[in-house]
Swiss-Prot record:
This is Proteasome subunit alpha. The gene is psmA. SMART domains: Proteasome_A_N. It comes from Methanocaldococcus jannaschii (strain ATCC 43067 / DSM 2661 / JAL-1 / JCM 10045 / NBRC 100440). NCBIfam families: arc_protsome_A, PRK03996.1. Keywords: Cytoplasm, Proteasome. It is found in: Cytoplasm. HAMAP family: Proteasome_A_A.
Length: 261
């Protein structure tokens, strides 16, 4: 029996490989892995979303590059992957939030909104003539005085996190989050942790390239952090990291000297 090469299964979105894989969905995930780093942190008094917009040309107008979007007063989304795909899903999320508000007279829950977006994503993995969305969204907001954070995968899978990251810097960021995150972390601490993670993922980070928003439990209102405040946070974080690196270097030198003795 002639073996069918793996490449034969990556042309149609609806065809599984013998290993049970949908190659087009995996390619969509790869688009996310190559995208800009986005971080979400759920804190006891609010939620933080932070993104490195990774602007490489001084000719680009920074305001034209959006990676964090307000969906409703109490909910926002950060994206990584194909920008055009993200825009379509953000528009749909805003529409769903407004339909729910007009129909029921109250805000849509964060989980319900995330599920609606994932339903759309999943449908685009099951029909011919379409392709998966090459983008992941971090959907975050306040539900009944509680910070909620969800990640939507190109396959349509939905996972709730305390803190997570998407994009090219995910491995570095997740290592730091798993080490530093606490259940009682405050919004101020979450902001500093998010900036620290972005700085570790990209040492050449610039304040004007960073987009950060918060939504507090107290008023459940979307708020963008000004670039001046981001600049101060980055300077504080870089100073702290430099001191830690210097201390580690001194410890290594002491250890080396003791071994030589």
């Amino acid at each position: 029996m002639q073996m069918v090469p793996p490449s034969a299964y990556d042309r149609a979105i609806t065809v599984f490989s013998p290993e049970g894989r949908l190659y087009q969905v995996e390619y969509a995930r790869e688009a996310v892995r190559r995208g800009t780093t986005a971080i979400g942190i759920a804190c006891k008094d609010g939620v933080v979303l932070a993104v490195d917009r990774r602007i490489t040309s001084k000719l680009v107008k920074i305001r034209s590059i959006e990676k964090i979007f307000q969906i409703d007063d109490h909910v926002a989304a950060a994206t990584s992957g194909l920008v055009a795909d993200a825009r379509v899903l953000i528009d749909r999320a805003r529409l769903e939030a407004q339909i729910y508000r007009l129909t029921y007279g109250e805000e849509i829950s964060i989980e319900m909104l995330a599920k609606k977006i994932c339903d759309i994503k999943q449908a685009y993995t099951q029909h011919g003539g379409v392709r998966p969305f090459g983008v992941s969204l971090l959907i975050a907001g306040i539900d009944k005085n509680e910070a909620r954070l969800f990640e939507t995968d190109p396959s349509g899978a939905l996972i709730e996190y305390k803190a997570t990251a998407i994009g090219s810097g995910r491995p570095v960021v997740m290592e730091l989050l798993e080490k530093e995150y606490r259940d009682d972390i405050t919004l101020d601490e979450g902001l500093e942790l998010a900036i620290t993670a972005l700085t570790k993922a990209n040492e050449d980070i610039k304040p004007e390239n960073v987009d950060v928003c918060i939504i507090t439990v107290k008023d459940a209102q979307f708020k963008k952090i000004p670039v001046e405040e981001i600049k101060k946070l980055i300077e504080k974080v870089k100073k702290k990291l430099n001191e830690e690196n210097k201390k580690e270097e001194e410890n290594r030198e002491e250890t080396k000297e003791k071994q030589e003795e």
